[in-house]
UniProtKB/Swiss-Prot annotation:
Signal peptide: none
Encoding gene per record: xseA
Localisation per UniProt entry: Cytoplasm
Reaction catalysed by this enzyme: Exonucleolytic cleavage in either 5'- to 3'- or 3'- to 5'-direction to yield nucleoside 5'-phosphates
GO cellular component: cytoplasm; exodeoxyribonuclease VII complex
Organism in which the protein naturally occurs: Synechococcus sp. (strain CC9311)
Name under which the protein is recorded: Exodeoxyribonuclease 7 large subunit
Amino acid sequence: MSAESLPSYSVRELNNAIGVLLERGFAPRFVIQATVSRPQVKKGHLWLTLSDGEASITAVAWASKLKQLDFVPADGDGVTVIGKLNFWSARASLAVQVLDMRPSLTTVLRRFETVKAQLLEEGVIDPSRHRKLPAYPNRLAVLTSVPSSALADMLRTAQDRWPLSELLVVPIPVQGEVAPIICGVLNRLAETHHQLGLDAIVIARGGGSREDLMVFDDAEVCRKLATFPLPVVTGLGHEDDLTVADLVADHRAATPTAAMVTLMPSRESAQQTITQRRSRLSEYKRWRLEQANSRLRDRHLLLDALRPEVTLQRRRDQWQQRQQLLRALSPQRWLNRGFAMLNTTNGQPIQSINDISLNEQLQILLKDGVIQAVAKTIQANETSNSKTSP
């Protein structure tokens, strides 16, 4: 093959031709999944190597784009990159220009487990630290992005369930490298919650990928939530999404809307509770009134019993009863019935022949007089062991 039949290029022309072929023959945008190695910032630009274990390529995020990224990778992180090819003809250098970059799910879950283990060891994740939520909150702070559909749903739910509660909406970024901003907001709320009259806070983010919730796996954000002076409720992502922030919160709700349902009593249940308590209060009042009336009746009876005329009548009745008893037991009653009483001369009753002696003077009492007598003989009954005189 003769050299005259082949295309002839200068180095510059060759590199330019290669650049044209790449620009025309390759996709203007593409997605690449890779592992990051040797990331470093030079003059505001992020340079890194993307590899998959078999091949590697240089990538760059220009300073203007780097400021817009929600995620800056560390060495060993898995990433999903949206990019395009950059070819520098002067030195025939090829690189992927990063247009967007997000962590892979593997990276997110690895960070989740790392931070979870760290906070478990520190005692920050501890169910025994969880505090009771207010039953009827007066004022709540809602930390979420503004505007957002999640916030709209939360406001609507709060209005439907318990319009008496006031919501203080605190805008925060909820995605990307925004942990310092969230920590700053939490610090300010912790310092001013008394003045603001807050009862609890809600930190929420609407649905998205698990990768979008990575900021809520940040260790410092989670420490701030765990030590916040008021109860904390999280409503982050979807029901299946679990972040470290959910583990340190006093209550984890599946969604932002569910967070409001958790904190806000429903008007219907509150009305039912009020009705039940009113009924119990009425029953209690009736019972107390009956008890008071019963005590009053008892005291009236006691007062009646202590009146002088009542006391006098009671004593009169007792005296009459005793008189009747005395009359019933009086010897005169037996004398009136024909019996006689035998006494010694000094008036001692004689009940047995052993109480007298022969020739002893006796008194025989009858109903209408006394007979003086002398004991001439003393004769015992056949069954008696008493003495007998001749």
